Structures are given as structure tokens and as C-alpha cells.
């Protein structure tokens, strides 16, 4: 096993622990809490894949971080922060919309790279809107937190989410997954639109297959 993979997991476990303490003291905003929940699932998946205990990894991660901070000068820290590009967190969905359980009458699931696509094939002749919460950097989607498809009545009929066991995905991964979800929903004569935010940063009116641009809602 690559030692860098192990140390990265250990540090991620400790940093998640620190962020959890922040949340427990009610110092985190909605995007912060959102990422915290998603990252917890991701760490569990990575731990299972690597065969590593999260509690033990957290303790080792703490030692790694403490050693780095001990060697890090304040001036070097300032320079690192100044040179790091800042990402933005964009939200189409509320916390309630993201955390709501949903059920499928005719479930269909497909894995596309590091993303899982789920949809209800029983949905027909509906107007559907795609909404997503994600981070953006350099005017492009950086990390998808969750994408869901909603009917006009607010029912959830589809979803794209990162696989906890396969962390990391690209803008193209997300774009391809959106295409699969839209294609599946349109197969049953549903009309699918995307949010303006998603249209701008992730979908960008794809026309590789001769499709007309989707109209933002």
C-alpha cells in the first residue's frame, strides 16, 4: 500500500475530527455542516477500502499535523494562505432537501466512474428540475456534494452522489453523470431542466450529441 495514501487518510481523519469539534460548538454554517456529513461517509468508505481503523488513523493524523505545525513558521503559513486559490460553495438545495429520504417505485442505479446515479423509472410525463450543491474554483465545478432531480411538486426522483469508496471526481465526471441522468429521465417523456447555477458551472449546454441546449429554470 502506498504510504502517501495511508498518511493522507490519517490526516483527513484528524482534520475531520477537528471540524466535528467546531460543529459541536455550533460554530459551523450550513455549507460547513453539509461537507462534514458528506466527508464522514467518504472517510468510512476509504477506511473500509484501505482496511484501516478510523480512530487509530485519527490519532496518527494528529501526530502528523502537530509535527508539521511545530515546524511551520507564521510567515510561511501566511504565504501559503495568500497563494492558495479560494473555492466557493454554491447551493441550489436547502439542508432539508439534501437530507430528505426518498423512495423509488422502479429503482435504477448506475455507477459512472466515482459517481453513483439513481433514478425512479416509474416517473413519466413530469417537469423536472436538477439542483445541486457543489464547490467551484477557477469558475469550474470543483467538488460535487450532491445533485438531485425534483418534480414541480417537490418530489425527489433522481440523484447523483459521489461514491464514498472512490473519493475525487472531475468536472467531466459530473458532466457525464448529468447526461446519463437526463437521458434516463427523458426516456419516459419527462421534461428536464437544470438550475441556473448548475447550467453555468457544470452542464454548460452540452451539445456533443447534437442535443439542443437545456433551458435554465
From Swiss-Prot:
A molecular function annotated in GO for this UniProt entry is: RNA binding
Q: What is the annotated role of this protein in its UniProt record? A: Inhibits post-transcriptional processing of cellular pre-mRNA, by binding and inhibiting two cellular proteins that are required for the 3'-end processing of cellular pre-mRNAs: the 30 kDa cleavage and polyadenylation specificity factor/CPSF4 and the poly(A)-binding protein 2/PABPN1. In turn, unprocessed 3' end pre-mRNAs accumulate in the host nucleus and are no longer exported to the cytoplasm. Cellular protein synthesis is thereby shut off very early after virus infection.
What does the record note on quaternary structure? Homodimer. Interacts with host TRIM25 (via coiled coil); this interaction specifically inhibits TRIM25 multimerization and TRIM25-mediated RIGI CARD ubiquitination. Interacts with human EIF2AK2/PKR, CPSF4, IVNS1ABP and PABPN1.
Location of motif Nuclear export signal in this chain is 137-146
Q: Which organism is it from?
A: Influenza A virus (strain A/Ann Arbor/6/1960 H2N2)
Nuclear localization signal (motif): residue ranges? 34-38
Q: What does the entry give for GO biological process?
A: symbiont-mediated suppression of host cytoplasmic pattern recognition receptor signaling pathway via inhibition of RIG-I activity; symbiont-mediated suppression of host gene expression; symbiont-mediated suppression of host mRNA processing; symbiont-mediated suppression of host PKR/eIFalpha signaling; symbiont-mediated suppression of host type I interferon-mediated signaling pathway
Keywords for this entry?
Answer: Eukaryotic host gene expression shutoff by virus, Host cytoplasm, Host gene expression shutoff by virus, Host mRNA suppression by virus, Host nucleus, Host-virus interaction, Inhibition of host innate immune response by virus, Inhibition of host interferon signaling pathway by virus, Inhibition of host PKR by virus, Inhibition of host pre-mRNA processing by virus, Inhibition of host RIG-I by virus, Inhibition of host RLR pathway by virus, Interferon antiviral system evasion, RNA-binding, Ubl conjugation, Viral immunoevasion
Pfam families associated with the record = Flu_NS1
As for family, the record states: Belongs to the influenza A viruses NS1 family.
Give the start-end ranges of region RNA-binding and homodimerization. Answer: 1-73
Has the keyword NADP been applied to this entry? no
CC terms in the record's Gene Ontology section? host cell cytoplasm; host cell nucleus
Which taxonomic lineage does the organism of this UniProt entry have?
A: Viruses, Riboviria, Orthornavirae, Negarnaviricota, Polyploviricotina
- The annotated region (CPSF4-binding) lies at 180-215
Query: Protein name, please?
Result: Non-structural protein 1
Q: How is it modified after translation?
A: Upon interferon induction, ISGylated via host HERC5; this results in the impairment of NS1 interaction with RNA targets due to its inability to form homodimers and to interact with host EIF2AK2/PKR.
Cross-referenced HAMAP family, in alphabetical order?
INFV_NS1
Q: Which domain of life is it from?
A: Viruses
Where does it reside? Host nucleus; Host cytoplasm
What's noted about domains in the record? The dsRNA-binding region is required for suppression of RNA silencing.
Q: Which gene encodes it?
A: NS
Amino acid at each position: 500500500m502506498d504510504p502517501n495514501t495511508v498518511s493522507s487518510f490519517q490526516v483527513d481523519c484528524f482534520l475531520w475530527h477537528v471540524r466535528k469539534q467546531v460543529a459541536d460548538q455550533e460554530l459551523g454554517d450550513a455549507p460547513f455542516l453539509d461537507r462534514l456529513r458528506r466527508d464522514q461517509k467518504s472517510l468510512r468508505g476509504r477506511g473500509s477500502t484501505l482496511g484501516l481503523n478510523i480512530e487509530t488513523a485519527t490519532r496518527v493524523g494528529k501526530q502528523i499535523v502537530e509535527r508539521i505545525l511545530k515546524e511551520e513558521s507564521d510567515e510561511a503559513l501566511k504565504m501559503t494562505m495568500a497563494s492558495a486559490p479560494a473555492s466557493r460553495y454554491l447551493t441550489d438545495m436547502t439542508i432539508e432537501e439534501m437530507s430528505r429520504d426518498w423512495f423509488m417505485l422502479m429503482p435504477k442505479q448506475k455507477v459512472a466512474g466515482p459517481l453513483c446515479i439513481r433514478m425512479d423509472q416509474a416517473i413519466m410525463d413530469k417537469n423536472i428540475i436538477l439542483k445541486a450543491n457543489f464547490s467551484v474554483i477557477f469558475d469550474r465545478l470543483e467538488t460535487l456534494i450532491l445533485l438531485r432531480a425534483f418534480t414541480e411538486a417537490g418530489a425527489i426522483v433522481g440523484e447523483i452522489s459521489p461514491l464514498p469508496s472512490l473519493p475525487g471526481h472531475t468536472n467531466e465526471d459530473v458532466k457525464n453523470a448529468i447526461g446519463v441522468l437526463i437521458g434516463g429521465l427523458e426516456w419516459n417523456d419527462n421534461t428536464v431542466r437544470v438550475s441556473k447555477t448548475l447550467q453555468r458551472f457544470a452542464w454548460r449546454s452540452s451539445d456533443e450529441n447534437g442535443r439542443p441546449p437545456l433551458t435554465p429554470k
